[in-house]
């Protein structure tokens, strides 16, 4: 097991900041004035081989493959002040405060509002099964949106969710977990301040999210992310609005392509007809005929 209890020296390494702890080195990038990257290097190799990122400030083994859709930027300017009890990295719009004992990282916006705070003793851990865990401070009435394709209510507060994509055909729209699309990104919205912040965990390994379902009175209320492999590699995206976070998240991972006009209409889709023992083509055509008889405009079927 590895647990980050205490922090040490914080160093300016040019394009990133290195944070020493008793357990593992962390690195912090100011990717832009509104996007931070916080990576805990449990594997120690700091390998960069992303297929997800369309904006980076570092070299990656996939740069040649992603040529034409990946933009290289210079890290945003920031100033480090390292002290005995804490370090401060001040950017144009974000400020990172690193408390050294107990160890935790906090992020503030330019108005001094707290956007993110780690939970001391829980934030950067590797358990006995080598799963890596990150815990973040939340409030009782926070809302959580995102996570890719999920069943149930849109707000995932007090939910526990697994991300292990598979063929979930015939799933229960209220309870089944997980479904097809694995996207470890979510937005936390504070009901009181109406401020939002985005969390993108840059990892394709199977993982799970506890969005305040677990409660321990030893610590402030928290959410947690646990991954079966890979580093804790968090991109923290400032808002304050949800619209701004989505814009910045898609700057980071890519924009959607422009859909054809037909995609704006009704598209029928079912595995039932193709898997019929016979006459599957006729069954598809019968479906189209039925939509016409019922006055349902159908633009396509797949």
What are these regions (language model features)?
Residues 1-271, 276-289, 300-301:
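N-terminal accessory segment at the very beginning of proteins
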Residues 292:
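Anion (oxyanion) recognition and catalysis
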Residues 295-297:
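Short loop/turn motifs at secondary-structure junctions
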């Amino acid at each position: 097991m590895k647990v980050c209890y205490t922090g040490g020296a914080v160093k300016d390494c040019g394009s990133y900041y290195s944070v020493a702890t008793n357990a593992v080195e962390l690195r912090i990038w100011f990717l832009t004035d509104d996007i931070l990257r916080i990576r805990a290097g449990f594997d120690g190799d700091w390998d960069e081989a992303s297929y997800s990122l369309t904006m980076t400030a570092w070299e990656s083994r996939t740069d040649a493959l992603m040529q034409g859709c990946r933009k290289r930027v210079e890290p945003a300017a920031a100033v480090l002040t390292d002290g005995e009890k804490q370090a401060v990295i001040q950017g144009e719009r974000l400020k990172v405060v690193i408390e050294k004992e107990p160890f935790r990282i906090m992020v503030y916006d330019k108005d001094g509002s707290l956007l993110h705070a780690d939970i001391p003793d829980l934030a950067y851990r590797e358990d006995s099964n080598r799963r890596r865990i990150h815990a973040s401070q939340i409030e009782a009435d926070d809302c959580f949106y995102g996570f890719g394709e999920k069943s149930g209510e849109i707000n995932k507060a007090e939910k526990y969710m697994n991300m292990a994509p598979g063929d979930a055909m015939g799933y229960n729209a209220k309870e089944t977990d997980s479904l097809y699309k694995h996207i470890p990104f979510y937005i936390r919205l504070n009901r009181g301040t109406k401020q939002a912040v985005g969390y993108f965990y840059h990892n394709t390994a199977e993982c799970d999210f506890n969005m305040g379902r677990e409660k321990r009175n030893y610590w402030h209320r928290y959410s947690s992310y646990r991954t079966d492999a890979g580093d804790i590699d968090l991109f923290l995206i400032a808002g304050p609005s949800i619209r701004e976070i989505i814009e910045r998240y898609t700057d980071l991972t890519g924009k959607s392509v422009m859909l054809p006009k037909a995609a704006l209409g009704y598209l029928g889709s079912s595995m039932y007809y193709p898997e019929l023992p016979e006459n599957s083509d006729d069954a598809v055509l019968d479906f189209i005929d039925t939509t016409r008889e019922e006055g349902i405009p159908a633009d396509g079927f797949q």
